[in-house]
Amino acid sequence: MEIGVDIVELERIERAHNRYGRKFLEKFMTQPEIELCLAKPSPVASIAGRFAAKEAVVKALGTGISGGVFWKSFEVLNDSRGRPVVTLLDKACFPPGCVIKISISHDRHSAIAAALLQYKTRGRC
């Protein structure tokens, strides 16, 4: 089992979004993630939460974004109950037998995410 955590200031995300617009979002989010976030009452908080979630996942993997896993190798959407769910889009980037769980929260100033990598089989990812 591995964990990763990330925290992001909402103001930082808001500045980048105001400056670069959709181009900023397209750097690290899939189209479904963008649509989900922009439909929320507080899009900046949702965008920051997704950013933190993606950072937490790569920290749990121990690779970082430049270590073979890219921003769009996976997406963070919601299930029917509203819980965030990680979907692996490029499974070749991820070790076999891994399941990733994610939790996201935010307040007026920041968003935080924690990722937990679990193994379906014995051994390491």
UniProtKB/Swiss-Prot annotation:
Tell me the InterPro entries matching this sequence. Answer: 4-PPantetheinyl_Trfase_dom (IPR008278), 4-PPantetheinyl_Trfase_dom_sf (IPR037143), ACPS (IPR002582), Ppantetheine-prot_Trfase_dom (IPR004568)
Instruction: Kindly list the positions annotated as binding Mg(2+).
Output: 6, 55
Instruction: Give the required cofactors.
Output: Mg(2+)
Recorded GO molecular functions are: holo-[acyl-carrier-protein] synthase activity; magnesium ion binding
Cell compartments where the protein resides: Cytoplasm
Show the SUPFAM superfamilies listed in the entry: 4'-phosphopantetheinyl transferase
| Gene3D superfamilies, sorted | 4'-phosphopantetheinyl transferase domain
One GO cellular component this record assigns the protein to is:
cytoplasm
The GO annotation for biological process reads: fatty acid biosynthetic process
What UniProt keywords apply to this chain's record, in alphabetical order? Cytoplasm, Fatty acid biosynthesis, Fatty acid metabolism, Lipid biosynthesis, Lipid metabolism, Magnesium, Metal-binding, Transferase
Q: Which HAMAP family match?
A: AcpS
Q: What's the stated role of this polypeptide?
A: Transfers the 4'-phosphopantetheine moiety from coenzyme A to a Ser of acyl-carrier-protein.
What name does UniProt use for this protein?
A: Holo-[acyl-carrier-protein] synthase
